[in-house]
């Protein structure tokens, strides 16, 4: 009789074997994902800490035969304390983002997945240069990941004097990649990131030596998110156990509820404990599994909790959304809205939406859809996303005045939450959650109504212009009558007065109507009136 052999593997080994789970499914996707992870970290190190971001992205081909590319991303953020660097880049699932506040990343995986992918196809380590704010030194690291142990391997660590008071982080990775297939997605990612962060500046140099610079348009940075306590609706049995273990010493369960959760005060705590049949003074360490299960069940069914706090969220804001849309698309109309906070499964979320219409936007069979989650542009897996579903399937755009078969329309939706329901660890599409889907539709309906008002008023103005332009052709007759009235019977004076009045009336009318039609002007000037 044969026996099965059982073994365990580390998180690093798991993601090395399954890179597609983190978005590293092929050489093109790996290059895009690496740029994305590094840029997200750079933005979290800057705008979250009220620093105007200056971000450099440089991609170079260093080994044409093996198709090895060098990716470098540098920011002017808060920097990383040197004792944190090894684990931050060399230990999978080690992160500063396991807190209840909105962050661009959420799994403690991103850059480590890029390092793992890098190690699979070439020998160079990840290179990190960093200096925390007010640090007197700049630190240099060369690192790899010990896949079996899920621990960093420090190959080099040095430091130099920080003579210019620089602060920030520069990360360099080498990886097997496909620039030609990744190029469009990377350009799209950088552009869409800039649309919602016009307070940042981006310098991007690609392997073909093309350089793009997106300049900073404003000094206004969105309010950063704050860390909050968990909401009772979002708890489970294991979370309660973890919170109890984390406490330095046992405390009465009543105090535990009041001090460790939002939306629970003295009265609410007493009600919960009464419903769960638990004594107020029982110590947390004395709770049995059955009692914890009972407590969680009561908390989930309790109806009187206040909604989760939105302090943990950071919206883009209507002004910045409109500024970004106008700067990239140059539309004739742009509008945005930020909805009020809502919650799903105990997690707060806010939906923002923006619309740009007309102007320089190219007509297309479907709206151009810009999807964002926690200020991250979502580029891949578009049609599996709930945002795409609402924009293309649930919105009847003709109801809002858009009658073109190929409308010049851009629709932007941003979801921010302490827990975005991504479909996978690759973080490229948002799952269908009823509460979120409803808010997306309501947000789009809000901005679409503003677009409808604009289109309706524009059409009325155009109709009025057409009627008034018809009346313009009477200017010569009116000028003739006024000339006869003003100067009497002197033909020479009548002719001069007629020409002068005709030009003045024509100029006033054209300016008033904002008509720029040279052919119409000539037609009016050459109009033959009855002999003066």
Per-range role (PLM):
Residues 2, 69-70, 95-239, 282-295, ...:
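GHKL-type ATPase core
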């Amino acid at each position: 009789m044969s026996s099965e052999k059982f073994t365990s593997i580390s998180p690093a080994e798991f993601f090395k074997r399954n890179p597609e789970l983190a978005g590293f499914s092929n050489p093109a996707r790996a290059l895009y994902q690496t740029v994305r992870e590094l840029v997200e970290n750079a933005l979290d190190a800057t705008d979250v800490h009220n620093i105007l971001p200056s971000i450099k992205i440089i991609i170079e081909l260093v080994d044409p035969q093996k198709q090895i590319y060098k990716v470098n991303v540098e920011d002017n953020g808060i920097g990383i304390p040197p004792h944190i660097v090894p684990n931050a880049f060399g230990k999978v699932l080690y992160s500063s983002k396991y807190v209840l506040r909105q962050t661009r990343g959420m799994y403690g995986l991103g850059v480590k997945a890029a390092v793992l992918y890098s190690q699979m196809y070439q020998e160079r380590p990840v290179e990190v240069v960093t200096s925390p704010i007010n640090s007197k030194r700049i630190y240099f690291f060369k690192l790899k990941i010990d896949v079996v142990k899920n621990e960093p391997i420090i190959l080099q660590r040095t430091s130099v004097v920080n003579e210019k008071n620089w602060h920030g982080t520069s990360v360099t990775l080498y990886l097997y990649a496909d620039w030609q297939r990744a190029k469009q997605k990377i350009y799209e990612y950088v552009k869409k990131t800039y649309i919602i962060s016009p307070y940042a500046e981006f310098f991007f140099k690609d392997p073909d030596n093309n350089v793009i610079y997106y300049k900073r348009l404003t000094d206004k940075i969105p309010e950063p998110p704050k860390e909050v306590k968990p909401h009772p609706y979002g708890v489970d049995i294991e979370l309660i156990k973890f919170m109890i273990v984390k406490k330095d010493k046992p405390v009465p369960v009543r105090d535990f509820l009041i001090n460790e959760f939002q939306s629970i005060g003295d009265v609410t705590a007493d009600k919960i404990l009464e419903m769960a049949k638990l004594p107020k003074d029982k110590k947390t360490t004395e709770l049995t599994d059955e009692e914890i299960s009972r407590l969680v069940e009561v908390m989930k069914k309790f109806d009187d909790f206040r909604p989760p706090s939105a302090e943990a969220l950071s919206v883009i804001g209507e002004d910045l959304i409109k500024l970004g849309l106008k700067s990239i698309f140059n539309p004739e109309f742009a509008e945005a809205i930020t909805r009020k906070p809502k919650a799903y499964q105990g997690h707060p979320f806010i939906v923002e939406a923006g619309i740009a219409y007309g102007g320089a936007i190219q007509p297309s069979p479907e709206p151009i859809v810009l999807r964002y989650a926690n200020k991250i542009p979502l580029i891949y897996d578009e049609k599996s996303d709930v945002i795409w579903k609402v924009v293309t399937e649930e919105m009847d755009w003709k109801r809002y005045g858009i009658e073109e078969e190929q409308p010049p329309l851009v629709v932007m939706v941003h979801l921010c939450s302490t827990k975005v329901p991504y479909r996978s660890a690759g973080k490229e599409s948002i799952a269908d959650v009823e509460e979120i889907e409803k808010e997306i539709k309501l947000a789009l309906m809000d901005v679409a109504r503003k677009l409808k008002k604009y289109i309706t008023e524009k059409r009325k103005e155009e109709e009025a212009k057409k009627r008034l332009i018809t009346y313009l052709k009477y200017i010569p007759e009116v000028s003739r009558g006024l000339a006869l009235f003003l100067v009497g019977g002197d033909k020479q004076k009548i002719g001069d007065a007629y020409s002068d009045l005709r030009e003045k009336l024509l100029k006033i009318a054209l300016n008033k109507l904002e008509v720029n039609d040279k052919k119409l002007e000539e037609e009016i000037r050459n109009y033959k009136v009855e002999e003066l």
